[in-house]
Curated annotation (Swiss-Prot):
Belongs to the cytochrome c family. It comes from the Eukaryota. This is Cytochrome c. The lineage of its organism: Eukaryota, Metazoa, Ecdysozoa, Arthropoda, Hexapoda. One of its GO terms (cellular component) is mitochondrial intermembrane space. InterPro entries: Cyt_c-like_dom (IPR009056), Cyt_c-like_dom_sf (IPR036909), Cyt_c_1A/1B (IPR002327). Pfam families: Cytochrom_C (PF00034).
Amino acid sequence: MGVPAGDVEKGKKIFVQRCAQCHTVEAGGKHKVGPNLHGLFGRKTGQAPGFAYTNANKAKGITWQDDTLFEYLENPKKYIPGTKMIFAGLKKPNERGDLIAYLKSATK
């Protein structure tokens, strides 16, 4: 299954409701409980400068792009066992597509 085309505005709402308590997206944004996500696409797991990642995140070694985020966001702890991300995931494919569309827009 490919990544469904997402709606940026719906994705922004999901980010605000489910992600913003732990993540920022703007350039130069601070790390919170989770890393700042600016420049996420094309970056390898565990590589945001200045954030203390688990060894599991550093060792995963994949590059964040639409398909890897789509799989990760469904069940983060299954995709990266040992991650400290406590988010249970987004089970609905369309919600993951919306969030990815927003992240692509907001983290450039």
